[in-house]
Amino acid sequence: SKHKADMIEAGWDVAVGHGNGPQVGFILRRSEIAAKYEGMHEVPLDVCGADSQGAIGYMLQQTLQNELVSRGIKKPVATVVTQVKVDKDDKAFQNPTKPIGSFMDEAEAKRRQAELGWNVVEDAGRGWRRVVASPLPMEVVEIESVRALIAAGTVVITVGGGGIPVIDNNKGGCLGTAAVIDKDFASSLLARLINADLFVISTAVEKVAINYGKPNEKWLDKITLAEAKAYLAEGTHFAKGSMAPKIQAVIMYLENGGKEALITNPENIGRALRGETGTRIVRE
């Protein structure tokens, strides 16, 4: 929260997205254990996502509010439980790849597949797991509320964990669906929808590198959209589960009218905003 407060103190209006990687899995696992041993109902995946937004949002808004108060800054902070619409025809639904929940034996996995329509896979010799789709985010359902809060001077925490995935219910409304949306893609969409001047991705490294971990490793200070696309296309620079989606998210943002993106680690956000470190990605 200190790093976000630094941005706010420097005059930025801030909207915050966050992941929910382990937490949503723990919520699901607790519900599966409670169902198995206590006969309680299992919590659907979309509701697990909502639970995680509430809990993580509460922690973020409280710690950020406390930090702002300690600096004498009067600025409200609020979390919006956020639904993100995906396309029910997204090809990700035909090829679910995200493992979630508990390990099962084959018999249990096959039973759930038959009774509940789950997609299940054998996971590296460790047992069977459910897999769900990771579709692309298309629309932030609560975007008007988010915009109104930002306009009123509120720091908004939104699209937590990539948002609660929902599909069109064919009546103009929404219906929750079992999926996981990439947090970087959802934050990229949010940045475009609020017309952000800067899209900051806070991660574990100070700068982005090409040839990461190799003798010819090179840390990048500033690259263009075209360079980012070329490096991504080469397929050898960015790890699939970590940096690659962040670069993809930046590309989506810049290709759809975004102005500038910045990737760095939390403790260097202040310095990176002053141009002293981090990797900036610009349109040209």
Q: For the regions a protein language model found, what residue spans apply to each?
A:
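C-terminal catalytic "cap/lid" subdomain
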Residues: 1-284
